[in-house]
């Protein structure tokens, strides 16, 4: 993945200053703790422990619980009482909800080390994880205050969370992007506003359009499918493939739309084969009502063997990964 970059003199001074500020803030927090527990802590946490556990702790994410554990010695006891394994407390960049918690993550991340999945913890990775907070103000902070680099994964994650304003910000500021992956993500997750923005902005290739349309059909995103049929005017060949993808996953609403509104040619017996093999009964009944041709016994057996082989290969690849 690459060697850890050596920090310049200016960068070292900046890191030193950040740590000094963090230490100063920690000392201030310690002084406040010397004043003793607040009325809120005593009243709610100490005297109404079960209410606090069921209505407060249960709402905290992993990172929130980690910060809570550092409040005082009682907080760890309370987490144990609530059933959390305090030896496995941790944090994630994507769960930071404010500039202050993100600043803490910036200071405490193991720069240059690898995550459990092998991803290098560099500036671009940090930026992409900030996107997962779904907060534009945090992305702006990490870019404009921390001058953090970004790469195609920033926009890939933007199209996972579906934040249009964040997407506009990325393009306005020259963020790299992967045309096919970003369009596929927006289609898969049903983010029509993001998908329309991408198609208007980057003018993707026909291959990308085909891939995104088929992804929408397979994932049951009817509004996205309508966009490709009614606004993008996809070809009959793509409509036919979208119909097959809808049947493959049992999306009856998408299948009906492709047949009744998109007027996709209903002349491929593979539709019946797919519905039979994957036991999508409603799709099967509908296809037969609409006069879809039936496969011969030999055709069905051949396709069933092909589907089975594909499943085995997919499962084998999943185990390897």
What are these model-predicted stretches?
Residues 2-321:
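Ankyrin repeat (ANK) tandem alpha-helical domains that serve as protein-protein interaction scaffolds
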């Amino acid at each position: 993945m690459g060697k850890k970059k050596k920090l310049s003199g200016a960068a070292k001074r900046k890191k030193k200053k950040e740590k000094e500020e963090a230490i100063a803030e920690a000392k201030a927090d310690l002084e406040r703790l010397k004043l003793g527990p607040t009325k809120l802590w005593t009243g709610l946490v100490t005297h109404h422990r079960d209410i606090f556990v069921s209505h407060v702790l249960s709402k905290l994410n992993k990172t929130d619980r980690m910060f809570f554990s550092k409040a005082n010695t009682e907080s760890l006891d309370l987490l144990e009482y609530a059933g959390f394994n305090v030896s496995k407390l941790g944090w994630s960049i994507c769960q930071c909800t404010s500039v202050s918690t993100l600043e803490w993550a910036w200071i405490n991340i193991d720069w240059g080390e690898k995550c459990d999945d092998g991803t290098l913890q560099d500036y671009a990775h940090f930026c992409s994880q900030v996107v997962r907070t779904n907060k534009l103000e945090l992305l702006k902070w990490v870019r404009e205050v921390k001058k953090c680099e970004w790469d195609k994964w920033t926009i890939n994650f933007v199209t996972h969370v579906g934040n249009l304003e964040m997407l506009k910000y990325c393009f306005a500021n020259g963020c790299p992007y992967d045309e096919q992956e970003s369009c596929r993500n927006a289609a898969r997750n049903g983010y029509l506003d993001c998908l329309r923005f991408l198609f208007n902005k980057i003018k993707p290739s026909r291959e990308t359009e085909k891939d995104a349309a088929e992804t929408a059909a397979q994932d049951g995103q009817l509004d996205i499918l309508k966009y490709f049929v009614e606004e993008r005017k996809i070809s009959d060949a793509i409509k036919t493939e979208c119909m097959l993808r809808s049947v493959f996953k049992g999306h009856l609403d998408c299948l009906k739309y492709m047949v009744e509104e998109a007027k996709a040619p209903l002349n491929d017996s593979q539709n019946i084969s797919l519905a039979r093999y994957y036991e999508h009964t409603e799709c099967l009944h509908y296809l037969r009502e609409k006069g879809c041709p039936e496969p011969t016994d030999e055709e069905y057996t051949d396709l069933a063997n092909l589907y089975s082989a594909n499943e085995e290969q997919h499962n084998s690849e999943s185990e390897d990964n």
